[in-house]
Swiss-Prot record:
Name assigned to this protein: Uncharacterized protein aq_271
Any matching Pfam family: Glyco_trans_1_2
Species of origin: Aquifex aeolicus (strain VF5)
InterPro entries for this protein: YkvP/CgeB_Glyco_trans-like (IPR055259)
Length: 403
């Protein structure tokens, strides 16, 4: 089994955990060659792929999709070569919509997702062959824990004042469509587990026919802008929720990890993070790490709480209905009601002032769960079996053509 793994330079978090999958496939006998599309000329890469003749092209988050032209129409490279493209998504496919923009509906394309709601995103992009795998981490990428806990409360960024986002997007879109932006954002803020497409379609139906007609006209004339519009709404909603919760931690000693744009609350400090390893070490130095999931990951468990657990910090995350199916709240992870500021504040005070032993107990159980249940093994076997089935079908078809 030959696989050409295509990447646009160095892969950042959380997509970097895909390397665990590549290692697993290698252990199963797959021959994998990596191609850096940032450093290499794409035409040279295509030429090498044509000469090497792999059955699979693979990437993460559709960042390695190459588009070529045939008969005046754009197709993904795999469709032109008669092979299969495989993408593993650690983030919402809507964020990467340009990969499929203006391209004929992909025929030989398989998507593996780690969030069930991303099925809606891929369907909107014309992708039908979709399989779900639960999140996993690459344990080899984790450094040793720092040991000393000198941070009481960490808060995972980035955090941007939502008003900054609103001011920015107001310059990018016609004013007559901004009510759709604001109302969809408000609806998603109140309903954290809703996907952007579901939210938008619901809110759209609440507007009068004249406004709907006006919006549809803009959408038809600006399909790319519409996709950016949706992504901007999710960004706005995420930042609104994060800033909302930070406001109610005003006065507590909080270290915000990553980019911060806006006025800091009392006793809050924004810490620039220059590398993935540095971020992990900040986790290891923190007693509690608050993580508010982005709206692009509405229902499931992303890899970030798993990283926090493995590095020895207690993840305090916004509750979602699916979380207990992954980790047990109060035993392997801790959660708070997404819009209940009192619940978040009370959980922090309880663990910091009354139950420090409980932090360590949950972290130990949670880290064990990560080591036992969130490695690539089962997911890798599933992916390998899917690719093996494709390989058998391909070889049978080739044999039939020869006969």
């Amino acid at each position: 089994m030959k696989i050409a793994f295509l990447r646009p330079g160095k892969i950042g978090t959380p997509a970097n955990h895909v390397y665990a999958l590549l290692d697993y496939l290698r252990e199963k006998g797959a021959e994998i060659r990596e191609y850096d599309l940032k450093e290499r000329d794409v035409n040279d890469v295509v030429k090498e792929i044509e000469e090497w003749k792999p059955l699979f092209l693979m990437d993460v988050n559709a960042t390695g999709v190459i588009v070529a032209e045939r008969d005046g129409k754009k197709h993904i490279l795999a469709d032109i070569l008669g092979i299969v493209h495989v993408s593993v998504f650690f983030e919402d496919p809507l964020l990467f919509f340009p990969a499929f923009e203006g391209v004929e509906k992909p025929q030989n394309y398989i998507a593996f997702i780690t969030e069930l709601k991303h099925t809606d995103s891929l369907t909107a992009l014309g992708i039908q062959n979709i399989s779900y795998i639960s999140p996993f981490v690459d344990l080899k990428q984790f450094p040793e824990s720092e040991g000393e806990k000198d941070i009481e409360i960490a808060f995972v960024g980035p955090v941007v004042d939502p008003q900054i986002i609103l001011n920015s997007v107001s310059q990018n879109y016609p004013q007559e469509i901004m009510p759709f932006f604001i109302e969809t954002g408000e609806f998603m803020f109140r309903n954290p587990e809703v996907h952007i497409l579901t939210a938008f379609n619901y809110v759209f139906g609440l507007f009068n026919p004249q406004m709907q007609e006006q919006f549809n006209k803009w959408r038809e004339q600006n399909p790319s802008a519409f996709m950016r519009f949706l992504n901007d709404i999710t960004a706005y909603t995420t930042m609104r929720r994060r800033m909302y919760l930070l406001h109610f931690l005003d006065g507590m000693d909080v270290k915000i990890l990553g980019d911060y744009q806006g006025n800091l609350f009392e006793n809050h400090e924004a810490i620039k993070v220059s590398s993935y390893e540095q971020l992990l070490k900040y986790y290891s130095r923190s007693n509690i790490t608050v993580y508010v999931s982005p709206q692009t990951y509405p229902t499931g468990l992303s890899v970030i709480p798993l990283e926090i657990l493995y590095m020895g910090s207690l993840p305090l995350i916004d509750f979602k209905g699916a979380i207990p199916g992954f980790l047990k709240p109060g035993e392997e992870i801790e959660t708070f009601a997404p819009l209940d500021r009192a619940d978040l504040e009370e959980k922090i005070v309880f663990y910091i002032e009354e139950n420090r032993e409980g932090i360590n107990e949950i972290v130990q159980r949670g880290k064990k769960a990560v080591q036992e249940r969130f490695t690539v093994k089962d997911r890798g076997e599933f992916v390998y079996n899917v690719l093996s089935d494709v390989k058998r079908q391909y070889e049978a078809a080739q044999k039939g053509q020869v006969n």
